[in-house]
Amino acid sequence: MQHSAWHTLIKEQLPEGYFAKINHFLDEVYASGTIYPPREKVFNAIQTTDLADVKVVILGQDPYHGPKQAQGLSFSVPDDIPAPPSLQNILKELADDIGVKESHDLTSWAQQGVLLLNAGLTVPAGQANAHAGLIWEPFTDAIIKVVNEKSDPVVFILWGSYARKKKNLISNSQHLIIESAHPSPLSAYRGFFGSKPFSRTNDFLVAKGLEPINWLA
């Protein structure tokens, strides 16, 4: 990330020395126990999707906290890992909206310009949200602010109350915000199912003269 557009623009949004603070945090927590995702995948979202390519942002809360699940991409798991409940519901809504995606791995979305960003980028094994509020929010808020400043239209997909709180970071009127209940089994029937975020995203992109996302890839 160090020589990327991401690095330069995120750095401008953060206090002096914040990257060093993050590296110190990572050194400490990875030395102290099992942390997900693997350290080399902590920044996978911005390493896979260049800033210039971002057309869509799907914001999650924090990584999966079970073995071999987290890849550094929100909601995604490797294909040899069963889809967790929220991802099952995302794929169910996708099937109802556009068609069936066979893969649980969402890397193909990231490679097409879908920034799969979690607000927190690390989690201890078995302890959801344990790193919330420690270091990540200023960093990931900075990423959202950087995307907000893009001159090209972007779709921000915000699922659930946590993600929807980030609306105040999205001030550019040319962007589209799609929001609904979270795909979690606890809330999916309260407005996530039937919200058609995938076709709505593509309709917007096409209307703006941009390539739609192949959500089934």
UniProtKB/Swiss-Prot annotation:
<dbReference type="GO" id="GO:0004844">
    <property type="term" value="F:uracil DNA N-glycosylase activity"/>
</dbReference>
<keyword id="KW-0227">DNA damage</keyword>
<keyword id="KW-0378">Hydrolase</keyword>
<dbReference type="InterPro" id="IPR002043">
    <property type="entry name" value="UDG_fam1"/>
</dbReference>
<dbReference type="GO" id="GO:0005737">
    <property type="term" value="C:cytoplasm"/>
</dbReference>
<keyword id="KW-0234">DNA repair</keyword>
<dbReference type="InterPro" id="IPR005122">
    <property type="entry name" value="Uracil-DNA_glycosylase-like"/>
</dbReference>
<dbReference type="GO" id="GO:0097510">
    <property type="term" value="P:base-excision repair, AP site formation via deaminated base removal"/>
</dbReference>
<keyword id="KW-0963">Cytoplasm</keyword>
<comment type="similarity">
    <text>Belongs to the uracil-DNA glycosylase (UDG) superfamily. UNG family.</text>
</comment>
<comment type="function">
    <text>Excises uracil residues from the DNA which can arise as a result of misincorporation of dUMP residues by DNA polymerase or due to deamination of cytosine.</text>
</comment>
<dbReference type="InterPro" id="IPR036895">
    <property type="entry name" value="Uracil-DNA_glycosylase-like_sf"/>
</dbReference>
<protein>
    <recommendedName>
        <fullName>Uracil-DNA glycosylase</fullName>
        <ecNumber>3.2.2.27</ecNumber>
    </recommendedName>
</protein>
<dbReference type="Pfam" id="PF03167">
    <property type="entry name" value="UDG"/>
</dbReference>
<feature type="active site" description="Proton acceptor">
    <location>
        <position position="62"/>
    </location>
</feature>
<dbReference type="InterPro" id="IPR018085">
    <property type="entry name" value="Ura-DNA_Glyclase_AS"/>
</dbReference>
